[in-house]
Amino acid sequence: MGQILLILLLQLIYVPVLTLRTIMLVKGRTIIAGVLGTVETLIYIFALGIVFRDLTTVGMIVYALGFGLGILIGGFVERKLAIGYNMIQVHTQDFPAELIQVIRDNGFGVTHYQGQGRDGIRYRLDVLAARTRMKVLRNLVEEYEPKAFLVAFDSVDFKGGYMLKGLKRSQ
């Protein structure tokens, strides 16, 4: 029974570490990804060694179950850490002057554009936001422009702009 619980525990650690390693690699944090990859491999070898030492159906099922539960935990951890930035586009039918001001008052940089849509003139706001602040931005948009169409893109790399100036001031 102790080995079964150990297999489960190792999987519940292994998969979230795997998730974080993948995220760090995608975000360009290769040193952290390398360290996490080493830890991940050690846990993987230990857990698999226990399963192969005593090939029982229960051990294999617990290994697979631990992997599935680990994915849930890894996803939860990733959402809580919210590493990185998103480029958010807010599309509106009317010029959102009040929303633009409120977004800026809340410390976000915003650039607005006018374009031609199928049914007439449309407006687009581009806002770069730390993922940890996405909920704040979403709530502002919902409050001031409830009919707005919102799209978020993962921003892996960027240079200059209002956000970096703001980050340098706050450090």
UniProtKB/Swiss-Prot annotation:
Keywords: Cell membrane, Membrane, Transmembrane, Transmembrane helix. Coiled coil: none annotated. The keyword Isomerase does not apply. GO terms for cellular component: plasma membrane. CDD domains: YitT_C_like_1. Its main location: membrane. It is found in: Cell membrane. The chain crosses the membrane at residues 4-24, 31-51, 57-77. It is a multi-pass membrane protein. Belongs to the UPF0316 family. This is UPF0316 protein Exig_2248. The lineage of its organism: Bacteria, Bacillati, Bacillota, Bacilli, Bacillales.
